[in-house]
Amino acid sequence: LLLSNTVEIAPLLCLVPRHPERFAEVADQIQDAGMKFRRRTEWIQTPKGGVDVDVILGDSMGEMPMYYSAADLVVMGGSLLPFGGQNLIEACAAGCPVLLGEHTYNFQQAALDAIEMGAAKRIKGKLLLSEPVALMDTLKELLLNTAELEKMSSAAKAYSIEHQGATKRI
């Protein structure tokens, strides 16, 4: 909602909790925030997905490649708070630019390499949902600057290609 007031096209937000036991909790949080949403399992049953929503809640497992293939940009939620981050390599393989918070210790080298190659940006500043200033500013900047978004997307693909075959090298 914050972002939809600042860009011409209201972005569709896909929230995908890492753990299934959080699906109901996240649904409640979205509803409490006053946002219209559908669970992905309900949304696909709607003809042509034709429901006016702000958020699609990913409520099934094993579908991240599908979300990445449909995304213009990924915010790696597990890095915004001290949870250590998530695997950004899959997002990069789909050509998705990645926005990271400061907490990437579970994927520290991968995050540093992606940032260095221009596939990811680290957001610093206030990242709490109660005051997401830095996150909103960065999202708005990228969504309005398609050339930069495309540049990051190309860098994400290049990053993925450069990091293929790690098992063979070990």
Provide a role label for each language-model segment:
Residues L1-I170:
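Nucleotide-activated sugar donor-binding and catalytic core shared by glycosyltransferases
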